């Protein structure tokens, strides 16, 4: 339901790439938001996860982004791309070319981040979570409207539960266990 809603929503389609990458690869939020174009290889279908983007409070400078090592030693890894993930990266690149959006920040020497906002700054996990909240709200409103109009029978009504971007990591783990 979620992925179909994103694919068919003009308003929320720009969220499809990062959500696809997080669901399909099981990346932590900081790993996904810290990905740079040089960390992915569309030819070999591999993602190099070798750092994480962190957001921290600095006493004098306020809140800042930084780069850190992955959470655990096993966090340094090569993640294979599914066809959906490869398509998501291609979609993100095309979206950025079409809109003129590009990374405008350098963080601890790292630049060219893939998932940036309309200002060219790195996505923050709380921004992703706010986007997910709006997606859930509008998707569920659409489903309820279809039910009220008779397009969907009440017994077939499915609504999205509340979840966060970290839940997408758990969704990936569940899918892998079920495979």
What are these regions (language model features)?
Residues 18, 26, 30-35, 81:
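Alpha-helix N-cap/helix-start motif at helix boundaries, enriched for small hydrophobics
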Residues 3, 34-98, 102-110:
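Conserved tyrosine-mediated DNA breakage-rejoining catalytic core shared by Y-recombinases
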Residues 4-15, 25, 79, 95-105, ...:
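Short, basic (Lys/Arg/His-rich) helix/loop patches that form interaction surfaces
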């Amino acid at each position: 339901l979620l992925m179909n809603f994103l694919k068919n929503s003009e308003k929320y389609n720009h969220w499809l790439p990062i959500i696809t990458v997080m669901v399909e690869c099981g990346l932590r939020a900081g790993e996904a938001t810290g990905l740079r174009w040089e960390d992915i290889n569309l030819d070999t279908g591999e993602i190099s996860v070798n750092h994480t983007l962190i957001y921290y409070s600095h006493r004098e400078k306020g809140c800042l982004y930084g780069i850190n090592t992955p959470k655990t030693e096993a966090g340094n890894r090569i993640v294979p791309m599914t066809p959906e993930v490869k398509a998501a990266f291609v979609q993100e690149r095309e979206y950025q070319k079409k809109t003129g959006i590009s990374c405008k920040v350098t963080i601890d020497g790292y630049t060219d981040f893939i998932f940036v906002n309309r200002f060219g700054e790195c996505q923050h996990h709380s921004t992703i979570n706010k986007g997910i909240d709006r997606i859930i709200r509008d998707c569920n409103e659409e489903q309820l409207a279809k039910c009220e109009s008779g397009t969907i029978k009440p017994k077939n009504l499915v609504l999205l539960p509340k979840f966060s971007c970290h839940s997408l990591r758990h969704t990936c783990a569940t899918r892998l266990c079920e495979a």
